[in-house]
From Swiss-Prot:
Its cofactor is pyruvate. The record marks G163, S164 as: Cleavage (non-hydrolytic). GO terms for biological process: phospholipid biosynthetic process. Its EC number is 4.1.1.-. One of its GO terms (cellular component) is plasma membrane. InterPro entries: PS_Dcarbxylase, PSD-A. The lineage of its organism: Archaea, Methanobacteriati, Methanobacteriota, Stenosarchaea group, Halobacteria. Belongs to the phosphatidylserine decarboxylase family. PSD-A subfamily. This is Putative archaetidylserine decarboxylase proenzyme.
Length: 196
């Protein structure tokens, strides 16, 4: 299965067309174009996922990059997505979407402190928030949900084309002691339990 929307084909078609034309002209660049198109399709893959037990699940594939208690006492966990990770994001806990807000910004590397000013989409419920953050190469954030929509844990939330980071602010009932992942741990969206 592929990520929702036309983006996979929008990004894969140009290198595929150039690659096929170059191959027809016996140019070795054709292989590069076809390989790039295949990579784009692979990058936008969307495998089925099921949560591994009760609790909050991580919203993104990748590496846990930050676990921090905010000034308001809420816990924020960030997951950095590398190029090899699935980039479809998942719902951490069931809830009704209150708002989906696009915030324009820069495109700094997602692992840097400068990413605090990057483009992002903030998805909020009464209990939790997920922030999808663009990075240096990730220029498109595609939310799948709208305000008023009821979501189940592990549902598809959106995707970021070509990378970056997803942060989740846990429900107020959870504190730092409830978090069962560690910084540097590899996690899978919609499967790995983040907090119990």
């Amino acid at each position: 299965m592929l990520a929702r929307g036309p983006w996979t084909w929008k990004y894969a078609l140009p290198p595929a067309v150039v690659g096929v034309a170059a191959l027809a002209a016996s140019s070795p660049w054709g292989v590069v174009g076809v390989a790039l198109a295949a990579f784009v399709v692979w990058f936008h893959r969307d495998p089925d996922r099921s949560p591994n037990g009760a609790g909050v699940v991580v919203p993104a594939d990748g590496t846990v990059s930050v676990i921090r208690t905010r000034d308001d006492g809420r816990v924020r966990v960030g997951v950095f997505m590398n190029v090899h990770n699935v980039h479809v994001n998942r719902v951490p806990v069931a809830g009704r979407v209150e708002s989906v807000v696009h915030e324009p910004g820069g495109h700094r590397p997602a692992f840097s402190k400068e990413s605090a000013h990057n483009e992002r989409v903030r998805i909020e419920t009464a209990e939790w928030t997920v922030v999808l953050i663009a990075g240096a190469f990730a220029r498109r954030i595609h939310p799948y949900v709208e305000a008023g929509e009821d979501l189940a844990r592990g549902d598809r939330l959106g995707h970021i084309s070509f990378g970056s980071r997803a942060d989740v602010v846990l429900p107020p009932a959870y504190d730092r002691g409830d978090v069962v992942v560690e910084s540097g741990q590899t996690v899978r969206a919609g499967e790995t339990v983040l907090a119990r």
